[in-house]
Amino acid sequence: MCFIDMASHRPVPADDFGAYYNLAECADYDSLPESKTQPHFQGVTGLRNLGNTCYMNAILQCLCSVSPLVEYFLSGKYITALKKDCSEVTTAFAYLMTDMWLGDSDCVSPEIFLSAVGSLYPAFLKKTQQDAQEFLIYVLNELHEALKKHCRRRVNEKRTGQSCCRKVPAQETSIITRLFEGQLSYSITCLKCESCTHKNEVFTILSLPIPSDYECSLQDCLQCFFQQDTLTWSNQIYCSFCEIKQEAAVRTTISKVPKIIVFHFKRFDIQGTVKRKLRTDIHYPLTNLDLTPYICPVFRKHPMYNLCAVVNHFGDLDGGHYTAFCKNSVTQAWYSFDDTRVSEIPDTSVQTATAYLLFYSCQPFSIPAQKRKSQDSTPDHCKQAIRKWP
């Protein structure tokens, strides 16, 4: 299973923060006043920049804020899936989450995790700027592949206006699919004979168009994504009833809502040789995001979502910088993560014009259950793999 633009003239070095903080867009949030002694809380840990790896650090901080995912690794549940097959990425991810939640340091290095990912995707070892959304897809896919198991499940299908339920062949599920996987349903209506067919597609990230160059809301982006499309001319589809290509109307709804829904804003616009970044100020709610208008009525459960993490992007297509805002389940406070720099921020500062990815949860996060750090039951073959890493 596979889950499914940057143009400054000078790439900014990994630790050259001054160039970014001179940008107006980088000064749109304030941290809370620092006390003389900053207490260290679980899950509030900085990450070292290993050379243009801010994209990775921002994604790791967001995943570190997803308590059900963290609990799965801290409790050792992932180890059962690795008894026979060792995934270096998964093992390194588990060790990193443990360090970020149970370690004593204010900052840790993700070098081992980057090395494991880079062994599969060498592009991430080049110390060049990468796209945070693409990195998230790679990480979720690798974790799913390592932790998946086969099971039979029921799938609902809508036929001729009625809902039916049928068994399907074994499906591959994991902690990743249980948390992040949703399903889109496409209703395709032939405009000639009015026959209707349906198609389903799973997703882990929804990439949303931005309908304005200046200012809009998340709801505006969602309405643009889910608006009915008409397929004409070269986009006509084959109608099995008419036995010829016809114009068609396509309506998209959500037929399965995920526990964690990730929105990606299409800020990078590339048309031929012309590249630009859309700097639209997108307003998004911190609480009570209602997706009911976009959910198929048959499966409607009226879930309300609360924001739990944000990935911000500063700069342009070929040279930019990523940071993250994450809500901690222990303190219930928001924190800004800028590589090794960590600071608490007020709720009012979470809304920025630089948001690139939004993580929403339909359930409040609790403090992750965990084993003692000394209780290491990692399989021996995984430990041997770890010893090979730098």
Swiss-Prot record:
This is Ubiquitin carboxyl-terminal hydrolase 50. GO terms for molecular function: cysteine-type deubiquitinase activity; ubiquitin-like protein peptidase activity. InterPro entries: Papain-like_cys_pep_sf, Peptidase_C19_UCH, Ub_carboxyl-term_hydrolase, USP_CS, USP_dom. It is an enzyme of class 3 (hydrolase). Its main location: cytoplasm. The keyword Thylakoid does not apply. It is found in: Cytoplasm; Cytoplasm, Cytoskeleton, Microtubule organizing center, Centrosome; Nucleus. It catalyses: Thiol-dependent hydrolysis of ester, thioester, amide, peptide and isopeptide bonds formed by the C-terminal Gly of ubiquitin (a 76-residue protein attached to proteins as an intracellular targeting signal). Pfam families: UCH (PF00443). Belongs to the peptidase C19 family. The active site is at C54, H321. The gene is Usp50. One of its GO terms (cellular component) is centrosome.
